[in-house]
């Protein structure tokens, strides 16, 4: 059985709900190895379990190699046999095991810490650590041969060539087993060695300057822990026990990130002591979690009637959970050792452009759909006010509010109804928004956000992919309009020709003098004359269309290239991270300058702007009849369903366990706050806003510290820590509000193709981690290129494709209603989203077995 297969079976064993560990006695083997070095070699990696969101264990691998003889090599072609075995070890309990504290105290008293090790090969790193023992008087071992000790750390793999291939003899490496599969913790490696000539135990920790690739499952090593000890020791003092102590500490990904930030040995020691205190407090609590509770957490039960009462319980619990940490939302990353001012600045700039440009685009669309009742100026004002209030008072400030395409569609439907029935648009719009806020407040007080537990991961990803498609569709529609007007349309050329005729005074009354016509022609600007001269005028429209397409694709290319730049090997890591965080602002500014200044002789399509006569005007809600108010209630109810689903869905994606947020959730309070904000926006005729996808998950990603690992050639990222702050959303909202001073210029210098490129960028970046999109891509790949995901290993391939096909059908159903040309069909779009719940629970299990559905759903719910 291969190593990966064995790990997979182990993960399935523990997911069944049994806790325990396997232990093999290695003492005899270690003695034999000392007596006959080279006759028999071992490579050991130990395993352990921890309760919580997943199962953590260490892998113990023993490789036994018989030296190949020359004649045997000739017969077998250099092939040798490797025997692999594993055993499980529990994490050290710092609350109960006194030895764990003594191991750490002994290390701190005679610490051997190497910071910023520049060596790149494992041999050089270990030799540096052994030399540290030799030079340190506290670790003097007069009878120890360093060359022999170095040889014992490695195992000859039996390679027939003169250059031997080395395998570590005895190591510990952390592994996390979840329902999604097995993940190696590749940033640290604990190496164990026993030797009779050693007098006492020794521990050395080396922190590498850069991650090193030392083979499979060790592709991003930053820490090396070396444990040396004599073989004859008390059972609680063996090399394995000491290694288990330090392996337990390094199994915490947050702790490893803290160690990376330390600058001196004293800070390194302080981090070790602090981690011991945390483990002492957390171990009893962690031990109380059972595997059954973990299983329930991953697959929450549907809420019962009693869960929705008492009235307002969820709101009160949210406030009590979030209020104690409210001051920290302003100080985290600003005060203390872990400062993140630079990341806050880049994230604020990213949010500013990510919010402002869609706001301008949808504001221009609202201006066209409402005949100027809601324009760009009002849309920017509403975005700024709503964003400020939500960033200040929300329970989860990482969620970003934004007006969206479905809301623009609802606004268009309201305008059509008002025109058909001769109603006051502002009053009817206000009543629809008030009813929407009333239902949202009712949902919040009744704790209906608990119903979101019914949404499986597959359903969430269908809706998320639908939103990404709408961004792509908006960009394509905009580009089609540009080509229709400038490339194919005759109206543009006729308009240009007529402007030339009027410019020269041809066709005027007989009283017009030639002198006036000549003056008009001479006073015309060079650009205007260039665009109206022949034959260039017949091609200027085509140039506009082609340039618009290039600018849109260029904005997408530059933005996404810089976004992925942090994964490249070029420049310093800090520079790569800064460029990645500022990818969107750089792309927008660059191609705005190219479109507006690089090609001044070519006309570019810009958004429509008409300044509002009264920015804040209260709607005359008393002017409508009771019948019209009742009609607005129906629209408000359907709109509230859209708000409810979008708000809770995006909040669930932000609060997902893999994001490692620690300050708690506030679904019910945030829903009530959303109702309050939209009440004010409705009364003043400003566009509605709700939680935006993918802006909110991208906001989390921008504030996250990420650790990478490589498995089978595929790079996976794990979020280590997220700065849960209000400052970035506050700063972006303030900048959006100040953008009102930039209207009409210089904001109108941003061509529409740049906005469309932004839409494509947002859609493309939102596909990262979307399992539905990944499974659709499998249809275009050969089977040997399939990634080693959990569903590939545990679900038959035919079932995977069946499930993907059924999800695509649901996605097409959403698109049929959400993108319909009939406005009234778009209004029932929220009902279609709700209809996916019975489809998932009642229809899909009849086609695909429930056990396979659960694996592919891989439910993660806070």
Curated annotation (Swiss-Prot):
<dbReference type="GO" id="GO:0005372">
    <property type="term" value="F:water transmembrane transporter activity"/>
</dbReference>
<keyword id="KW-0813">Transport</keyword>
<feature type="topological domain" description="Extracellular">
    <location>
        <begin position="771"/>
        <end position="774"/>
    </location>
</feature>
<feature type="topological domain" description="Cytoplasmic">
    <location>
        <begin position="845"/>
        <end position="862"/>
    </location>
</feature>
<keyword id="KW-1003">Cell membrane</keyword>
<feature type="topological domain" description="Cytoplasmic">
    <location>
        <begin position="747"/>
        <end position="752"/>
    </location>
</feature>
<feature type="transmembrane region" description="Helical">
    <location>
        <begin position="380"/>
        <end position="393"/>
    </location>
</feature>
<keyword id="KW-1133">Transmembrane helix</keyword>
<dbReference type="InterPro" id="IPR016152">
    <property type="entry name" value="PTrfase/Anion_transptr"/>
</dbReference>
<dbReference type="GO" id="GO:0006820">
    <property type="term" value="P:monoatomic anion transport"/>
</dbReference>
<feature type="transmembrane region" description="Helical">
    <location>
        <begin position="429"/>
        <end position="452"/>
    </location>
</feature>
<dbReference type="InterPro" id="IPR011531">
    <property type="entry name" value="HCO3_transpt-like_TM_dom"/>
</dbReference>
<feature type="glycosylation site" description="N-linked (GlcNAc...) asparagine">
    <location>
        <position position="511"/>
    </location>
</feature>
<dbReference type="GO" id="GO:0005452">
    <property type="term" value="F:solute:inorganic anion antiporter activity"/>
</dbReference>
<feature type="topological domain" description="Cytoplasmic">
    <location>
        <begin position="565"/>
        <end position="577"/>
    </location>
</feature>
<feature type="topological domain" description="Extracellular">
    <location>
        <begin position="367"/>
        <end position="379"/>
    </location>
</feature>
<feature type="transmembrane region" description="Helical">
    <location>
        <begin position="775"/>
        <end position="797"/>
    </location>
</feature>
<dbReference type="GO" id="GO:2000739">
    <property type="term" value="P:regulation of mesenchymal stem cell differentiation"/>
</dbReference>
<dbReference type="Pfam" id="PF00955">
    <property type="entry name" value="HCO3_cotransp"/>
</dbReference>
<dbReference type="InterPro" id="IPR003020">
    <property type="entry name" value="HCO3_transpt_euk"/>
</dbReference>
<feature type="topological domain" description="Cytoplasmic">
    <location>
        <begin position="646"/>
        <end position="670"/>
    </location>
</feature>
<feature type="transmembrane region" description="Helical">
    <location>
        <begin position="461"/>
        <end position="481"/>
    </location>
</feature>
<feature type="transmembrane region" description="Helical">
    <location>
        <begin position="543"/>
        <end position="564"/>
    </location>
</feature>
<feature type="transmembrane region" description="Helical">
    <location>
        <begin position="753"/>
        <end position="770"/>
    </location>
</feature>
<comment type="function">
    <text>Multifunctional transporter with an impact in cell morphology and differentiation. In the presence of borate B(OH)4(-), acts as a voltage-dependent electrogenic Na(+)-coupled B(OH)4(-) cotransporter controlling boron homeostasis. At early stages of stem cell differentiation, participates in synergy with ITGA5-ITGB1 and ITGAV-ITGB3 integrins and BMPR1A to promote cell adhesion and contractility that drives differentiation toward osteogenic commitment while inhibiting adipogenesis.</text>
</comment>
<comment type="subunit">
    <text>Homodimer.</text>
</comment>
<keyword id="KW-0039">Anion exchange</keyword>
<dbReference type="GO" id="GO:0034599">
    <property type="term" value="P:cellular response to oxidative stress"/>
</dbReference>
<dbReference type="GO" id="GO:0005272">
    <property type="term" value="F:sodium channel activity"/>
</dbReference>
<feature type="topological domain" description="Cytoplasmic">
    <location>
        <begin position="1"/>
        <end position="343"/>
    </location>
</feature>
<feature type="topological domain" description="Extracellular">
    <location>
        <begin position="692"/>
        <end position="721"/>
    </location>
</feature>
<feature type="topological domain" description="Cytoplasmic">
    <location>
        <begin position="453"/>
        <end position="460"/>
    </location>
</feature>
<dbReference type="GO" id="GO:0016324">
    <property type="term" value="C:apical plasma membrane"/>
</dbReference>
<feature type="topological domain" description="Extracellular">
    <location>
        <begin position="820"/>
        <end position="823"/>
    </location>
</feature>
<feature type="transmembrane region" description="Helical">
    <location>
        <begin position="824"/>
        <end position="844"/>
    </location>
</feature>
<feature type="topological domain" description="Extracellular">
    <location>
        <begin position="416"/>
        <end position="428"/>
    </location>
</feature>
<feature type="transmembrane region" description="Helical">
    <location>
        <begin position="578"/>
        <end position="599"/>
    </location>
</feature>
<feature type="transmembrane region" description="Helical">
    <location>
        <begin position="344"/>
        <end position="366"/>
    </location>
</feature>
<dbReference type="GO" id="GO:0015106">
    <property type="term" value="F:bicarbonate transmembrane transporter activity"/>
</dbReference>
<feature type="topological domain" description="Extracellular">
    <location>
        <begin position="482"/>
        <end position="542"/>
    </location>
</feature>
<keyword id="KW-0769">Symport</keyword>
<keyword id="KW-0406">Ion transport</keyword>
């Amino acid at each position: 059985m291969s190593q990966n297969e064995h790990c997979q079976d182990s993960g399935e064993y523990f997911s069944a709900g049994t806790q325990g560990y396997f232990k093999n006695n290695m003492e005899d083997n270690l003695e034999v190895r000392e007596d006959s070095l080279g006759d028999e070699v071992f490579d050991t990696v130990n395993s352990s379990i921890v309760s919580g969101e997943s199962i953590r264990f260490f892998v113990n691998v023993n490789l036994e190699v018989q030296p190949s003889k020359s004649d045997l090599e000739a017969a077998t072609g250099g092939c040798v046999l490797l025997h692999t075995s594993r055993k499980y070890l529990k994490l050290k309990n710092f609350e109960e095991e006194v030895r764990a504290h003594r191991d750490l105290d002994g290390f701190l008293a005679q610490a051997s810490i190497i910071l910023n090790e520049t060596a790149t090969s494992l041999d050089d790193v270990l030799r540096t650590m052994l030399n540290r023992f030799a030079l340190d008087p506290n670790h003097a071992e007069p009878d120890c041969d360093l060359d022999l000790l170095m040889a014992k750390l490695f195992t000859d793999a039996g390679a027939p060539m003169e250059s031997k291939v080395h395998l570590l003899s005895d190591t510990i490496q952390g592994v996390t087993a979840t329902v999604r599969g097995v993940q190696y913790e590749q940033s640290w490696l604990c190496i164990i060695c026993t030797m009779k000539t050693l007098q006492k135990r020794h521990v050395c920790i080396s922190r590498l300057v850069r991650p090193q690739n030392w083979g499979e499952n060790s592709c991003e090593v930053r820490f090396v822990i070396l444990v040396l000890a004599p073989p004859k020791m008390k059972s609680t003092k063996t090399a394995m026990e000491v290694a288990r102590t330090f392996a337990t500490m390094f199994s915490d990904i947050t702790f490893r990130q803290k160690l990376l930030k330390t600058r001196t040995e004293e800070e390194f020691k302080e981090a070790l002591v602090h981690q011991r205190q945390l483990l002492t407090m957390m171990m009893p609590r962690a031990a109380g979690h059972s595997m059954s509770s973990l299983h329930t957490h991953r697959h929450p039960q549907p809420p019962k009637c009693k869960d929705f009462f008492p009235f307002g319980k969820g709101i009160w619990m949210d406030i009590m959970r979030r209020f104690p940490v409210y001051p920290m939302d302003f100080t985290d990353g600003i005060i203390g050792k872990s400062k993140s001012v630079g990341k806050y600045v880049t994230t604020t700039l990213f949010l500013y452009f990510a919010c402002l440009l869609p706001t301008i685009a949808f504001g221009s669309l609202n201006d066209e759909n409402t005949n100027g009742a809601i324009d760009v100026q009002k849309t920017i004002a509403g975005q700024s006010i709503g964003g400020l209030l939500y960033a200040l008072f929300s329970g989860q400030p990482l969620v970003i509010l934004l007006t969206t395409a479905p809301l623009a569609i609802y606004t268009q439907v309201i305008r059509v109804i008002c025109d058909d029935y001769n109603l006051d648009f502002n009053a009817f719009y206000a009543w629809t928004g008030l009813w929407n806020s009333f239902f949202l407040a009712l949902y919040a007080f009744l704790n209906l956000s608990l119903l979101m537990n019914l949404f499986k991961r597959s359903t969430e990803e269908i809706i998320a992919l639908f939103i990404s498609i709408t961004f792509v569709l908006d960009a394509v529609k905009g580009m089609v309009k540009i080509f229709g007007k400038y490339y194919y349309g005759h109206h543009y050329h006729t308009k240009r020709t007529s402007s030339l005729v009027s410019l020269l005074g041809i066709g005027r009354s007989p009283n017009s003098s030639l002198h006036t016509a000549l003056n008009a022609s001479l006073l015309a600007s060079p650009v205007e004359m260039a665009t109206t001269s022949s034959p260039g005028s017949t091609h200027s429209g085509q140039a506009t269309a082609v340039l618009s397409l290039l600018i849109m694709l260029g904005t997408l290319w530059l933005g996404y290239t810089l976004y992925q730049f942090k994964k490249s090997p070029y420049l310093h890591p800090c520079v790569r991270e800064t460029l990645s965080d500022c990818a969107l602002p750089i792309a927008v500014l660059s191609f705005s300058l190219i479109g507006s200044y690089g090609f001044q002789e070519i006309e570019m399509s810009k958004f429509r702007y008409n300044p509002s006569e009264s920015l804040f005007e209260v709607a005359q809600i008393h002017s409508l009849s009771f019948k019209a108010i009742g009609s607005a209630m129906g629209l408000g109810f359907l709109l509230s369903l859209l708000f409810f689903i979008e708000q809770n869905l995006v909040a669930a994606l932000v609060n997902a366990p893999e994001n490692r947020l620690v300050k708690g959730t506030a679904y019910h309070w945030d829903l009530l706050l959303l109702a309050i904000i939209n009440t004010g926006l409705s009364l003043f005729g400003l566009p509605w806003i709700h939680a935006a996808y993918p802006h909110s998950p991208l906001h989390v990603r921008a504030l996250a510290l990420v650790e990478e690992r490589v498995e089978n050639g595929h790079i996976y990222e794990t979020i280590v820590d997220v700065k849960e702050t209000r400052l970035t959303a506050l700063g972006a909202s303030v900048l959006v509000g100040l953008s009102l001073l930039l209207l009409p210029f210089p904001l109108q210098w941003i061509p529409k193709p740049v906005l469309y490129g932004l839409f494509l960028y947002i859609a493309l970046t939102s596909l990262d981690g979307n399992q539905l999109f990944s499974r659709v891509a499998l249809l275009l790949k050969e089977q040997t290129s399939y990634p080693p995901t959990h569903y590939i290993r545990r679900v038959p391939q035919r079932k995977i494709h069946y499930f993907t096909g059924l999800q695509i059908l649901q996605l097409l159903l959403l698109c049929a209603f959400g993108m319909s040309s009939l406005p009234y069909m778009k209004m029932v779009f929220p009902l279609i989203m709700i209809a996916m719940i019975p489809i998932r629970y009642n229809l899909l299990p009849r086609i695909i077995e429930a056990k396979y559905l659960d694996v592919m759903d891989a439910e993660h719910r806070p």
